[in-house]
Amino acid sequence: MSLIEDLKALKATAVARINATEADVEALRVSLLGKKGELTALLKGMKDVAPEERKTVGEIGNDVRQTITTLLAQKKAAEETARLNEQLAAETIDVTLPGSAHQVGQPHVLQQIIDEIEQHFLGLGFEIIDDIVDSPEVETDEYNFERENLPKDHPARDMQDTFYITPEILLRTQTSPVQSRSLEKHDFSKGPLKMIAPGKVYRRDTDDATHSHQFHQVEGMVVGENITMADLKGTLLSIMQKLFGEKHQIRMRPSYFPFTEPSVEVDVSWNEVTPDMKPEDIEWIEVLGAGMTHPNVLRMDGIDPEKYSAFAFGLGPDRFAMLKYGVDDIRQFYLNDVRFLSQFNRKGN
């Protein structure tokens, strides 16, 4: 049999073997096309072919190689497709089933209260000042005390134990200094100043159920012409009803703060007030301090108290959260116990 006939015979048998094989395609490729494969062995006989037949034999040899290579590639692709389909069938996923639930975070309960306060005052036209430039937590004695009508020898300084860093630098005990910094920059030709300043403050208190060395405060202030105590009362009533409900009322009691005159303590009704309720049936709880800004405070900030008047107030988000949710220990807010904090879901409250 001539080499041409041998090549044609190999092509026919190779096609049949490839189509019928269930074995490893790679092993079949090696047996046909490898260095010791059947086609390679036949083509070694090219040296014995007459020169005039070598071209024809070479073309037939290339055709056999190409045919085998193409069929092997198709067979391999078909096997891979079949294997993938089998795998997909075995790993069928019902896309209608719910996915794995992911735990979703939420703002801390104190941040929720602060956000609620901020949104309310934004609706009243107030600006929020809480940046590090105008609301630093490390403050000077001048802004924290002296600008608030508390000179170095003032007895009211004993009311606040302070974390001093140096004799003139301290951790602020209140957010009131933000008022002074805001007044220094405000252009009253554009209208009155209406601002709140939320932030952390620090006192040298012993931590217990109602005290913390660090807590939150929201200072508020309105400065303009003809600002009265009635404006203060209306403002405070609106935020108390926002936090506790529209049927709650407030009352003001005379008090003393160095930076306001007159000064008041503000109580909110613990129970809802109805028109037919007797005064003695209303339960009151103290929630904040406020008053008309002292003329000395305005003067130290470059404001003429003969032309402008102002009111100021200080809200305690920590205390509001305790009252609103019936929490009896302020330390619970700072222990990072997710079991406790997860109760205060913003959507659910």
Curated annotation (Swiss-Prot):
Pfam family, one: Phe_tRNA-synt_N
Keywords carried by this UniProt record: Aminoacyl-tRNA synthetase, ATP-binding, Cytoplasm, Ligase, Magnesium, Metal-binding, Nucleotide-binding, Protein biosynthesis
Signal peptide positions on this chain: none
GO CC terms of this entry: cytoplasm
Main EC class the enzyme belongs to: ligase
E.C. number(s) listed in UniProt: 6.1.1.20
Keyword flag Transmembrane: no
GO MF assignments: ATP binding; catalytic activity, acting on a protein; magnesium ion binding; phenylalanine-tRNA ligase activity; transferase activity; tRNA binding
Cell compartments where the protein resides: Cytoplasm
Protein residues bound to Mg(2+): 261
Coiled coil region boundaries: none
HAMAP family to which the protein is assigned, alphabetical: Phe_tRNA_synth_alpha1
Quaternary assembly: Tetramer of two alpha and two beta subunits.
Family, as annotated: Belongs to the class-II aminoacyl-tRNA synthetase family. Phe-tRNA synthetase alpha subunit type 1 subfamily.
Name of the protein in question: Phenylalanine--tRNA ligase alpha subunit
Organism: Leuconostoc citreum (strain KM20)
The organism's taxonomic lineage, starting at the top: Bacteria, Bacillati, Bacillota, Bacilli, Lactobacillales
